[in-house]
Amino acid sequence: MLLPKRVKYRRQHRPKTTGRSKGGNEVTFGEYGLQATTAAWITSRQIESARIAMTRYMKRGGKVWIKIFPHTPYTKKPLEVRMGSGKGAVEGWVAVVKPGRIMFEIAGVPEEVAREALRLASHKLPVKTKFVKREELGGDTNES
């Protein structure tokens, strides 16, 4: 599972999930991508589960890039504990995903295989997603 090697502070405030993603909105490494259309926290377990679903369907063919990383800790207080007396212990790590963010990319497989692999991965995630292709740069070149 993914988690940071070390952090400066163990606990953080909850991150905002409003607005659209500022970066990571284009397919950069692979040919096809899985883009979030809603906002959510995605845990390291969900990322790993989606990765396993994709690689199993592709039968170890092609290459997968994970473009999100769970940097943010989330905390939880024990059951039946009264409010107050500090923030709870770190329960796990999450990646904050906003609409427009490309979460996974795939290359080296046909489009049908990539579409199905990303569909299987999307079932493991708490966000609505859509399949996107890389937009090739070209055609409109300035030759002066």
Curated annotation (Swiss-Prot):
GO cellular component, one term: cytosolic large ribosomal subunit
GO terms classed as biological process: translation
Gene name per UniProt: rplP
Function of the molecule: Binds 23S rRNA and is also seen to make contacts with the A and possibly P site tRNAs.
Disordered: region residues: 1-26
Pfam families from the UniProt entry: Ribosomal_L16
InterPro entries (UniProt xref): Ribosomal_uL16, Ribosomal_uL16_bact-type, Ribosomal_uL16_CS, Ribosomal_uL16_dom, Ribosomal_uL16_sf
An MF annotation (GO) of this entry: rRNA binding
UniProt feature, compositional bias: Basic residues: 1-19
Keyword terms: Ribonucleoprotein, Ribosomal protein, RNA-binding, rRNA-binding, tRNA-binding
Subunit record text: Part of the 50S ribosomal subunit.
PROSITE patterns xref list: RIBOSOMAL_L16_1, RIBOSOMAL_L16_2
Lineage: Bacteria, Bacillati, Bacillota, Bacilli, Bacillales
Segments traversing the membrane: none
Protein name in the entry: Large ribosomal subunit protein uL16
Family listed: Belongs to the universal ribosomal protein uL16 family.
NCBIfam families from the UniProt entry: rplP_bact
